[in-house]
């Protein structure tokens, strides 16, 4: 992308940094990770968790959610102004699982938000450390991306459920800042914009008055974020049209859906980061590892190396397969929900199977589930190779894909040709090329028609041995192109419900 020079790196967004050099970035990301680790250790002490209980991913998620809720200012304010029955706006909590007499027991805990904020700040040199909070949000978002399909949400906004590869980050909260915006897929941004336009159509005051002015600024900002994800001039020009519209309505919704479809072939730039659960960072800090001094990167070898040496456990329901549970969490850790399964399999060193073939439900346990039959097992989160995470969609001058998911959004910068089902995608582009965006639409369709799946994306990038930390000798993997590449293929994943 031409504008690369003006952009802050994702690590800088992650740590609210101004321009920094690589060493400073590694140090500030390390500081953020260390803060999460220290906080987690302190929480385990407060809750008197054993080492095993502290490494249980379900306990980690509860603790992460508590601190995110404690700092959710908007919701806290709302809860105080609209008191609801049985909800104390000043408290936060969730299920903590303990091993008692050879059985797993659920205990619902409740803490003052003020107390949680104090522990968090104390672990982060007295600062609010928003970057660390965002990091945990992205981990939860990546876990949701690997666990659920967003079919219903896509259909509700008039999009096609087969566009699910564009939906990365669709469950990220609004307050996730620049780092959050960077990891959102094209479909996620389109969906947010469509929801906004629909509100404007239904509520005449939406764009009016002082509030309307703020709404308008938010709308234009979201348009610019989406525009920045596109890599071709015609797609960006269309985004300018959508942004400058006096009174956004159905024409803009049409344009946005058109752009989302076009992104299946002319892929957008979406960042990928390996965000790990707090129960990985905690024990590393406890063992004496100094993240700030050693430096850390979310897009290099560091997360792979950390997972090679980590022990994480998970509760397992009676008919779940622990290996499948491990795959789900591995994909979440590396933000690989929409990556080509062949690439993921090669890097992981064990076959990564489509979502529909997994015998596992989500990681979190509902409050009405029976604990009597719960078991626990070790999650296998190690990998055979590592690869650099990408922030682009691959070369856009782009074999078969499937009925479920008809494209991929690459996570790893690995040389391969990107599969897409041209006939399926192009079928969606019949008809409407008139109107004020006609020339751009025609241009985009022309580019898509001339795109060739055989063209290799990420020229010369490969995977690396775990001993090759400077990424000096790339291994370019060969893929069996007859295998199915998409994760949500012909799928029955559960829907994501708030």
Curated annotation (Swiss-Prot):
SUPFAM superfamilies: flu NP-like. InterPro entries: Flu_NP. Keywords: Capsid protein, Helical capsid protein, Host nucleus, Host-virus interaction, Ribonucleoprotein, RNA-binding, Viral nucleoprotein, Viral penetration into host nucleus, Virion, Virus entry into host cell. GO terms for biological process: symbiont entry into host cell; viral penetration into host nucleus. One of its GO terms (molecular function) is RNA binding. The keyword Ribonucleoprotein applies. Its main location: virion. Residues 8-21 have a biased composition (Basic and acidic residues). Late in virus-infected cells, may be cleaved from a 56-kDa protein to a 53-kDa protein by a cellular caspase. This cleavage might be a marker for the onset of apoptosis in infected cells or have a specific function in virus host interaction. It comes from the Viruses. Residues 1-21 are annotated as: Disordered. It is found in: Virion; Host nucleus. A motif (Unconventional nuclear localization signal) lies at residues 1-18. GO terms for cellular component: helical viral capsid; host cell; host cell nucleus; ribonucleoprotein complex; viral nucleocapsid. A motif (Bipartite nuclear localization signal) lies at residues 198-216. South Carolina isolate has been sequenced from formalid fixed-lung tissues of a 21-year-old male which died in 1918 at Ft. Jackson, SC. Brevig Mission isolate has been sequenced from lung tissues of an Inuit woman buried in the permafrost in a gravesite near Brevig Mission, Alaska. This sample was recovered by John Hultin, retired pathologist. Homomultimerizes to form the nucleocapsid. May bind host exportin-1/XPO1. Binds to viral genomic RNA. Protein-RNA contacts are mediated by a combination of electrostatic interactions between positively charged residues and the phosphate backbone and planar interactions between aromatic side chains and bases. Belongs to the influenza viruses nucleoprotein family. This is Nucleoprotein. It comes from Influenza A virus (strain A/Brevig Mission/1/1918 H1N1) (Influenza A virus (strain A/South Carolina/1/1918 H1N1)). The gene is NP.
């Amino acid at each position: 992308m031409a504008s690369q020079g003006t952009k802050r790196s994702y690590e800088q967004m992650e740590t609210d940094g101004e321009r920094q050099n690589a060493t400073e970035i590694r140090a500030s990301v390390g500081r953020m990770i260390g803060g999460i680790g220290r906080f987690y250790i302190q929480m385990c002490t407060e809750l008197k968790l054993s080492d095993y209980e502290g490494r249980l991913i379900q306990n980690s998620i509860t603790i992460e959610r508590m601190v995110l809720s404690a700092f959710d200012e908007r919701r806290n304010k709302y809860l105080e102004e609209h008191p609801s029955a049985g909800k104390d706006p000043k408290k936060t909590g969730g299920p903590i699982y303990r091993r008692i007499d050879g059985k797993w027991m659920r205990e619902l805990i409740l803490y003052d938000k003020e107390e949680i904020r104090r522990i968090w700040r104390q672990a982060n040199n007295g600062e609010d450390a928003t970057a660390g909070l965002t990091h945990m949000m992205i981990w939860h978002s990546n876990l949701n991306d690997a666990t659920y399909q967003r079919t219903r949400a896509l259909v509700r906004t008039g999009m096609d459920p087969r566009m699910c590869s564009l939906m990365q980050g669709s469950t990220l909260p609004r307050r996730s800042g620049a780092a959050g915006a960077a990891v959102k897929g094209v479909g996620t941004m389109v969906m947010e914009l469509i929801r906004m336009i629909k509100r404007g159509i239904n509520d005449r005051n939406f764009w009016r008055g002082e509030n309307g002015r703020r709404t308008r600024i938010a709308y234009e900002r979201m348009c610019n974020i989406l525009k920045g994800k596109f890599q071709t001039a015609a797609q960006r020009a269309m985004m300018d049209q959508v942004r400058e519209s006096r009174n956004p309505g159905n024409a803009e919704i049409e344009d946005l859906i058109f752009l989302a479809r076009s992104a299946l072939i002319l892929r957008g730039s979406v960042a990928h980061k390996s965000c790990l659960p707090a129960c990985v960072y905690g024990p590393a800090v406890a063992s004496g590892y100094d993240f700030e001094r050693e430096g850390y990167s979310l897009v290099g070898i560091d997360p792979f190396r950390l997972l090679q040496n980590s022990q994480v456990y998970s509760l397992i329901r009676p008919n779940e397969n622990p290996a499948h549970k491990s795959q789900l969490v591995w994909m979440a850790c590396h933000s690989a929900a929409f990556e080509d399964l062949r690439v993921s399999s090669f890097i992981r060193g064990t076959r990564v199977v489509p979502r529909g073939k997994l015998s596992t439900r989500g990681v979190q346990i509902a409050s009405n589930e029976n604990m009597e039959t719960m078991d626990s097992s070790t999650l296998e989160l190690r990998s055979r190779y590592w690869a650099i995470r990408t922030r682009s969609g691959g070369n856009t001058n782009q074999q078969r894909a499937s009925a479920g998911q008809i494209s991929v959004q690459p996570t790893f910068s690995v040389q391969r040709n990107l599969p897409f089902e041209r006939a399926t995608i192009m079928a969606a582009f019949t008809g409407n090329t008139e109107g004020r965006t006609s020339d751009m639409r025609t241009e985009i369709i022309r580019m898509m028609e001339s795109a060739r799946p055989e063209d290799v994306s990420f020229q010369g990038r490969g995977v690396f041995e775990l001993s090759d930390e400077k990424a000096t000798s790339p291994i370019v993997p060969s893929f069996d192109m007859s295998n199915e590449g998409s994760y949500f293929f012909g799928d029955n994943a559960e829907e994501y419900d708030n």
